[in-house]
Amino acid sequence: MSENTLSERNRTEGQRIAVVLFNLGGPDCPEAVKPFLFNLFSDKAIINVPQPFRWLIAKIISSRRAPVAREIYGHIGGRSPIVPETERQAEAIERVLSDLGEVKCFIAMRYWHPFADEAAAKVAAFNPDKIVLLPLYPQYSTTTTASSLKDWHQAWEKQVGPGRALSKSLETKEICCYPEAPGWIEAQAALIRHGASSFFSAWTSEKCGGGG
């Protein structure tokens, strides 16, 4: 372990650290599919045209795509798995970082609940010494990382400043981006190998069984 790493660890031990995980979000029920799509396509980072045209375009696209998307989600339980999966990631991060102090993860989705406003209010109630912003997008894009961080900073502005218990000077660190981070590519490759192996095993069994 490097001297810098030890110094950082000693400096953070005993602190309350809020880790905010950012992701796209997804509908949590069939009724949420259309408003989720509307939120997605009304984002200026996605469709960069002036209002009211962006609103109109988002309305048209979400209305047309909702029935098809709803049917697709129906094959996986009628909802997106992104929030439960992100909650599992949050729990794992808390376990790994528990020796640094009181570490708590919060989830901020971009286009459906829990939104950044909801996460910011929970972070404020936690009253951390430090905030770590962690977009779960390995590669940077204005439509993902940039949009999520901009949304967060707007939400956080409502929680700080005059008359608020939290200061704007609260230490905040953004982690971006990590497409070549140690272990990342290996982890993705392992998932692909596992998925491919499962698929081909099932395919082979089906073909062999059918051929018998």
What residues fall within each predicted segment?
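Active-site-proximal alpha-helix that buttresses catalytic centers in soluble enzyme cores
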Residues: S2-G212
